[in-house]
Amino acid sequence: MFLTNLTLTNYRNYEHETLSFDQGVNIILGENAQGKTNMMEAIYVLAMAKSHRTTNDKDLIRWNEDYAKIEGRAEKRSGSLALELTISKKGKKARCNHIEQQRLSQYVGHLNVVMFAPEDLNLVKGSPQVRRRFIDMEIGQVSPVYIHDLSQYQKLLQQRNHYLKMMQAREQHDEAVLDVLTEQLMVLAAKITLRRRQFLALLEQWAMPIHHEISRGAERLHIRYEPSVDVSEKAELSRIVEAYSETFAAMREREIQRGTTLVGPHRDDIAFIVNGKNVQTFGSQGQQRTTALAVKLAEIELIFSELGDYPILLLDDVLSELDDFRQTHLLDAIRKKVQTFVTTTSIDGIKHDLIQEAAIYRVHSGSVAAPS
């Protein structure tokens, strides 16, 4: 798939901008704080209905304006696609082919993107929350049902935590209510756990050979899912539900004492293991970068294998972070098949053959000069 055009209205520092894009490589060139990353973020938000940089949607609206709008047209194997996302202080409204989507989970997945930015090193060395967010966003692109289940889980988790807080303060003591909340929560938790495990197994299949090649055959990558309940790697949904039931029963008194839910997908983690060692703890910066790059390239292939279209690749100020060998491997992997957007302050750090192929856009103070 590829994005043919993009219109931004009141988005961050863009008042109104309409752009057409090349099917291959598009380089967004400009100094810092001019709007390069904002444009990259807008493409991501158009696809995912949320930002990778902020959890506050109000940050996306231009100063002193009431709303922001992102519009785009994409070409997919199945045909042309018109997308529109309006962000206001009241929330978000999404349209696909001019039809309003009742839920954002119905909207996400029409346009697929893979983002690779310097902060993606945190995928390997950052907190478990970063890795959970990563897996949730990526599964959501290929499974709208997962987004719905995750949303329901988060709502139930808030309700259960609130009730546990009241039990902790002795404002409530009816354990039958807690039983109902727990039963509803553990079914959703089991579905999420199973889908995460399946997704990570697929991701590992794609990432292992890519990582082996980037490391010049010196390293072997494994991706290990670490759920908050003890279940075998081949456990079916019913067994995972049982495991949650047993664990919740064992943890009940501690949860009431603490006033919070101590078990569930919100406590999961992912470990990246290279040559038998956790890269987060024992890996060098080079190994962490190689792992992050392999995972991002694996995402591209996984999405293609699931959906039949390659996603759009967003490289936000990341090429300068990669040495020549890793840059070459990245560019060879995407050339001729993946529409790519690259932001940079200078083309000096980008390989010459890529520059020759690229359409170059120059950004200054929220205004974009398209290629002549």
Curated annotation (Swiss-Prot):
It comes from Geobacillus thermodenitrificans (strain NG80-2). Keywords: ATP-binding, Cytoplasm, DNA damage, DNA repair, DNA replication, DNA-binding, Nucleotide-binding, SOS response. GO terms for biological process: DNA replication; DNA synthesis involved in DNA repair; double-strand break repair; SOS response. One of its GO terms (molecular function) is ATP binding. GO terms for cellular component: cytoplasm. The gene is recF. InterPro entries: DNA-binding_RecF, DNA-binding_RecF_CS, P-loop_NTPase, RecF/RecN/SMC_N, RecF_2. This is DNA replication and repair protein RecF. Belongs to the RecF family. The RecF protein is involved in DNA metabolism; it is required for DNA replication and normal SOS inducibility. RecF binds preferentially to single-stranded, linear DNA. It also seems to bind ATP. ATP binds at G30, E31, N32, A33, Q34, G35, K36, T37. Pfam families: SMC_N. It is found in: Cytoplasm.
